[in-house]
Structure formats: C-alpha cells, structure tokens
Amino acid sequence: MDRLLRLGGAMPQAAPPTDAPVVDTAEQVYISSLALLKMLKHGRAGVPMEVMGLMLGEFVDDYTVQVIDVFAMPQTGTGVSVEAVDPVFQAKMLDMLKQTGRPEMVVGWYHSHPGFGCWLSGVDINTQQSFEALSERAVAVVVDPIQSVKGKVVIDAFRLINPNMLVLGQEPRQTTSNLGHLQKPSVQALIHGLNRHYYSISINYRKNELEQKMLLNLHKKSWKDGLTLSDYNEHCSINEDTVAEMLDLAKNYNKSLEDEEKMTPEQLAIKNVGKQDPKRHLEEKVDKVMQNNIVQCLGAMLDTIVFK
C-alpha cells in the first residue's frame, strides 16, 4: 500500500527534489542526405501501404543523434499500421552491413504515413517502447511520402514521454536551447497524443560540400540527352498536333489584327488582359517545333554516320 501511495504522489517521499536534472530539449536529429533519400524512396514505393525500416547512426553526445544510413524491413503493413520488427532479419542485416564497412549501431526506426501526416498511433507507440527498452534515446521518425514535395519534406521525429514523470508530477521536458525549430503540431497529431504520450524532436540536415555537389548532379542533364532520338511515330503525331495548334493560333492572330484596326488606344491597352495572346503562343509553338525537328534530324544523321 505504501508503494502505491508513493507512486501516486500522495506521500512526501514522491515529491521530486528541486535540483534534480530534467530531460533536455536541445537535442537534435541530424539526418544525412543518403538516409533521407532512401526513406522517401522506400515510402513512395510502398504507397498506399505503410512501410518501415531501421536507422543506423550514432549518439554523438547528449544533444546530437546522427542518422547516417537506413535499411528497409520486410514487414507486412496496412494503410494505418505496420507490424513489429523481425529480430532475425535485423541481426543478419547488421552483420552484412559491418562486412561492407557500415559499423554504425541502430539509433531508431522510421515508418511512413502515406497521406495522413506525422504522428504515432497506438501500435507505433508500442513499437517505440520496445526500442526504448533497448536504448532510452531511440528515435522514431515518421515520413509522409504523399504530402512531401520538392523542397519540403513532411517528416518528424518523436520520442516517448516517461509516464512515471507525469504520475509524480514532474515536468517531462525543459527548454534550454533555441537550436533548430520544431514542426508545428497538427490537430491530428495532438489528438493522437503529441505532448502527452510522446514529444517531437527537431530535425536538421547536415550536408558537406561533396554531398551538395552530388545532390545538384542527381537529375542534371548531360549533352547526350539532347541527341536522344524519340520514337518516330510519336514524333510525327506531336508534329501534326503542333501544326494544327499553330493553324488555330494563326487564325486567331489574324482576327486580332483585324480587330485592332477598329479599337481605340484605351481598348488596345487592355485587349489581352485575361485572354490568350495568340502572337506569343504562336512564337512559342514555332520555336518548339523547330527545336524538336532539328534535334531529331541531327540525331538521325549522326546515328547514320556512326553506325553505318
């Protein structure tokens, strides 16, 4: 009975000491470019189902968690949950990664929420509890591959709040730094227990000069892309459609010239407001069809000479 009273905070022994250290919130999760790309690619491939995987990295200090790489887990998922981790596959995968020069430890796990934001469900909280039983600083990352667009990744990192702290009346966290910024919590995340059962950790992306060059060259076109031949049937149909559009634009341009002769200067100033400018569109179509045909003819001639 005494233990129950102490646990409930009804006795003086349950009061926390005033100088006791409180959990710090200055912690940041640094995710590498490779890990972020692999998480987004894995999440996009699993749509509309949830997917999950493990994050490899290191706990640099009390304020830094570095995620260097990730790998996918072969689990079955539904639209709203994923099952627990397979320990046998995890052990074999870590052994094989060590042989390839990837000795980092597991710092947490990630999973996708395709289309419904970043938060932890009841199943996710149970999975995170199993990770935090092995390491108190384990991180759960949630990524939304549907809402993520170029230049804005919808992602967030979470860690559970110790329920014993709330029972004893202690503050679960304290803010001692302004590094980084937290994601603005959504209504759905607050409904599912954000800041009650788990809290958010700020995420940062640390890139060196070589990684920036690699990312800039990821979808960069080379000189040979301009000489790639398109399918002749497709090229012919595109030419026919473009010429038909040019004919309509030429008729509209001729009609607009006739109308301009009857307009006053005030009417001429606003005649194209909110309307299609046939002259400009006609010039664009002519430039486009000339470029496509020149590249197609040049590529065909080069192929004829080279592979003769």
From Swiss-Prot:
Keywords, ordered alphabetically: Hydrolase, Metal-binding, Metalloprotease, Protease, Proteasome, Ubl conjugation pathway, Zinc
GO biological process, one term: proteasome-mediated ubiquitin-dependent protein catabolic process
Class of the enzyme per the UniProt entry, highest EC level: hydrolase
Single GO MF annotation: metal-dependent deubiquitinase activity
Mitochondrion in keyword set: no
Chain residues that bind Zn(2+): H111, H113, D124
A Pfam family recorded for this sequence: JAB
A GO CC term attached to the entry: proteasome regulatory particle, lid subcomplex
Enzyme Commission no: 3.4.19.-
Annotated MPN domain residues: 29-164
Motif window: JAMM motif: 111-124
InterPro entries with a match to the protein in the record: JAMM/MPN+_dom, JAMM_MPN+_peptidase_M67A, MPN, RPN11_C
SUPFAM superfamilies membership: JAB1/MPN domain
Biological role: Metalloprotease component of the 26S proteasome that specifically cleaves 'Lys-63'-linked polyubiquitin chains. The 26S proteasome is involved in the ATP-dependent degradation of ubiquitinated proteins. The function of the 'Lys-63'-specific deubiquitination of the proteasome is unclear.
Subunit structure: Component of the 19S regulatory cap of the 26S proteasome.
Family, per entry: Belongs to the peptidase M67A family. PSMD14 subfamily.
Designated name of the protein: 26S proteasome non-ATPase regulatory subunit 14
Origin species: Drosophila melanogaster
Lineage, opening ranks: Eukaryota, Metazoa, Ecdysozoa, Arthropoda, Hexapoda
